[in-house]
Amino acid sequence: MTSPTSLDQLKQQIKIAPIVEHYAIKLKKKGKDFVALCPFHADQNPSMTVSVAKNIFKCFSCQVGGDGIAFIQKIDQVDWKTALNKALSILNLDSQYAVNFYLKEVDPKLKRYWDLHSALVDYYQTRLKLEPKEQGLTYLTETRKLSPQVIERFQLGLAFTLEDQYFLPSLLNYPWISPAIEKAELCFATEKFPEALGFFNQQTHYATFKSRIMIPIHDLKGNPVGFSGRALQKTEKIKYKNSAEHQWFKKSELLFNFHRIDKNTLKLYLVEGYFDVFALTSAGIGDVVGLMGLALSESHIIAFQQQLKALETVVLALDNDTAGHDATFKLLQELNAHGIIVEVVDWNQAAYKDWDELFLAEGSDAVKAKTHRVLNLVEYLVAYFKTKGFDERITVNKVIDIIAQNQKVTADTSFSRFLCQKLQQLLQYSDVETLFTQLQQQKLKVKVNKTTTFTQRAPIYESVVGVVDNSFRNESQPVAITKEFLVENNWKETKERVFHAEIFAYVLLDKQFLVELKQSDLDELFASLQTPLFDVALFIDKARLYWAKVQEPDWAVFNSILGEQQAMFPTTFLAQIKEFFLNKSLSYDPEDYEEDLQFFRQLIVKQKELLKYFKSMVEH
């Protein structure tokens, strides 16, 4: 191998195709490139392209891409240096020159960043131990009731009141780092030191952190990358002060305590705050991570999939407030769509806002007991949609739609049936077989690319609900999803939705309101509702016919006179769209017809909004 003289030359020598194949990913030739199942999301149809000419990979579903080094970084969740070394090893490239030269130029900055933070962790921990207890240790042990073991486990430290005076001299004389720390590295970023940490202001001579408990934050591999400082004084307006955002410290890409999780864990608890993590840890729940915000990023999902390979269940245990409840529903949908079983802690109108409050009020036993009170997917969703005021039919449809997004669940017949049983029991709606059939139909409507196959996966039912009689289990047969199936299925789905009795024309959500409209109200009420979706004049004629024959409101009669599915909707529009895409042979993409059919759904939404508006006008 010729020693490279530029970064581009080094990357050219690290070929992408053999690196991808090293991870047992099968490449299939497609033109000049290769395609493969993407390892970074639940890919059922090859959506990752590997370009030999460009020496890169790109997934057009999850948008992950890059060169060979980036691929290793993503799949192994390692830093650039480790990925480079592994790439050279995979390709049997002897390039000590490349390692020495380029790691000095690129990677040492990141390594230095970690080393500086390690020194800071050590410094703040030492401060906590050396300063009088009332400066910080008393706050942790008495006010926050944390044990010495928890304090040590999380490397908690203290930025004491005199940091303005002692911070710089202490760090500049810190002996366990080479080369020695420079003042500019600790101050705010400059042109010479763009990676400076921002812990001291040279102009004002003020330390960024003082009178705060310092909580070290690590990246997903356990390297220290930042801090969050918890104010000790109640008068301090800013309760938590974090390290400045940096290319290596992006809160949205981090999970507090992730690097300490048992990599063979089956269940992971997801909470909001640092002290919530401390509360669960104090109660003996070690596999708990804290969100650095209220959202999960793609890097979080990849970390779950790549580093927690045995993970089956994520328990959402966010705060018991409006923001926590809203975030729970969003996170549930995201995790569920990635094939993760989701449970939700049942706060059950508890008086406490979060785990820290519960821990301080009732202790670790109460925390541990609460972690065992969880709702499964269906139990949570039924309760959630009830708070939104949805009736049983709408709730069933929404719950089944969410279940159908999880291919791991729908591939397990027993678990799917169990969830349908729970849904029927909670709502006393329909019957189990009907709901199960609806779920099977809905899972086929989940968006897929041109051709894919659903196959039976390893059973998960027993691990969740115990051993049961599985005699009724039927092994799933592969179902080929073709272009014709997609078009036909989506057309039928759209047609059913626009013709459904409760959203058809102006029937929508309030049948009685429409029936009670007098003939004199019709012209004014519907005059402005001209849309290409239906024939307004024909609707008015039908309504007048009803009032001419019937003097008392009667929905059944009104419905029959209206003619339901034949009165006003131009069915030929949908039929033409269906025929167009079935006959279309070039440049076919499943999303093409979706945009056209979505037009009709948007009109339905518009009808609902208009109905609500006009109803309010009539009532007032």
UniProtKB/Swiss-Prot annotation:
Q: Name one GO cellular component term.
A: DNA-directed RNA polymerase complex
PROSITE patterns on file:
TOPRIM
Q: What cofactor requirement does the entry state?
A: Zn(2+); Mg(2+)
Q: Which major enzyme category is it?
A: transferase
Q: What is its EC number?
A: 2.7.7.101
SUPFAM superfamilies this protein is in? DNA primase core, Zinc beta-ribbon
Entry keyword set: DNA replication, DNA-binding, DNA-directed RNA polymerase, Magnesium, Metal-binding, Nucleotidyltransferase, Primosome, Transcription, Transferase, Zinc, Zinc-finger
The free-text note explaining how the cofactor binds reads: Binds 1 zinc ion per monomer. Binds two Mg(2+) per subunit.
Q: Which reaction does it catalyse?
A: ssDNA + n NTP = ssDNA/pppN(pN)n-1 hybrid + (n-1) diphosphate
Zinc fingers, CHC2-type, are found at: 38-62
GO biological process annotations for this chain's record? DNA replication, synthesis of primer
Q: Name one GO molecular function term.
A: zinc ion binding
Residues recorded as binding Mg(2+) 2, renumbered to this chain, are: D319, D321
Cited Pfam families: DNAG_N, Toprim_2, Zn_ribbon_DnaG
**Which CDD domains does the entry mention?**
TOPRIM_DnaG_primases
Sequence ranges assigned to domain Toprim in this UniProt record: 266-350
The UniProt annotation places Mg(2+) 1 binding at: E272, D319
* Family named by the database record: Belongs to the DnaG primase family.
Domain commentary: Contains an N-terminal zinc-binding domain, a central core domain that contains the primase activity, and a C-terminal DnaB-binding domain.
Self-association or partners: how does it assemble?
Monomer. Interacts with DnaB.
**Biological role stated in the UniProt entry:** RNA polymerase that catalyzes the synthesis of short RNA molecules used as primers for DNA polymerase during DNA replication.
Protein name as it appears in the record: DNA primase
* Source organism per UniProt: Mycoplasma pneumoniae (strain ATCC 29342 / M129 / Subtype 1)
